[in-house]
Amino acid sequence: MATAILDTGDRTFFTRLNRILFTNPFAVEPREVSELLCTEVVIDRQAPHLFTTLIPVVEARFERLAARGFDTLRPFHGEDRELLEHARLFLVYHRFVPQLDRLIAAEIDSGKPEPVSFSRDVLGALTERGFSERVAERHLGLFWQLRRAYYFIDSGLLGTSPCMKQLRHSLWNNVFTYDARVYDRYLWNRMEDFSTLILGETGTGKGQAAAAIGRSGYIPFDARSSRFKASFTASFITINLSEFPETLIESELFGHRKGAFTGAVDNHQGVFERCSEHGALLLDEIGDASLGVQIKLLRVVQDREFTPVGSHTPQRFAGRVIAATHQRLNELRHEGRFRDDFFYRLSADIITVPTL
């Protein structure tokens, strides 16, 4: 098949479109969309998002390409192919937003992975346009992640003030990084390597912010069962370190084996063992952790391993670590009550929740 090339007008349009599509949705301005549409955009407060105003224009561009005989991506290569892929993914994603929303509601009700009744339609819409089956399945997982992230970041937090808009912006960047292109290419299945530290006064909603991150991780689609491999309802676990005495905290974190200490009459799974590989664990009130506990937590964050109390066999932790505190950690570090190396490992991204 001969290689097709976009003309100058189409390449300019799709390049500008891609720039908008990879923008944080909580930062898109009407001006950017207006410039692409060459007309002033009137904000519809009832519309799901400003992005939806682009749908008919993008569809029209693809119809023009189809009229020239290019109804799939297969003839295109290199940068042209990449530009068109992202535009096609944009259309397919928005076509299935209502079904994704219903699936979110169904899993909230059931607490388990629900059948993805529309999966064949999504995969077909992609493969018939030139995506391989493997790539189509990966993008179905990304569609699911995108919709959950928008749902929990948008509706899981209260308020529309500038500081809350900035918080939503920061949470989205935490899930998809500051460069969504890099995330799409390299990091979509590696975000557990990056810990997050959430700071804020008591009662400001640090837990809700952490939950928005924890429920928005990438979960692969399983074509054999036509379900996603885990439910986001079980993907977020939290433990408040201030609630446990020093004698129990290690058991709650790492678990223990039968006979490890007086009263250990059975094996016990700690939160690290219970956390899904597609999920996240919130260590709330991390400032209350003793230096001894910090050393053991550092091992988990650094080496991704932990050992239950009474065991000599290390276990692998595959989830993501989120820590939160109302305390001023820099003061604790200065006083020698919080380890510098542990602080740096936790703070790959620091998010500050505004006061009410």
Please identify what each model-predicted range represents.
Residues 100, 104-111, 182, 186, ...:
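Long, hydrophobic, amphipathic alpha-helical segments used as structural scaffolds
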Residues 153-194:
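Pre-Walker A (pre-P-loop) alpha-helix and adjacent loop at the N terminus of AAA/AAA+ ATPase modules
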Residues 1-159:
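N-terminal accessory segments that target, anchor, or regulate ATP-driven/P-loop NTPase machines
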Residues 121-133, 143, 166-168, 302-303, ...:
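Short, mixed-charge, low-aromatic patches
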Residues 108, 131, 180-187, 222, ...:
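Short, flexible helix-adjacent loops and helix caps
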Residues 103, 178, 182, 216, ...:
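Solvent-exposed amphipathic alpha-helical surface segments
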Residues 194-356:
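Conserved catalytic/coupling elements of P-loop NTPase cores
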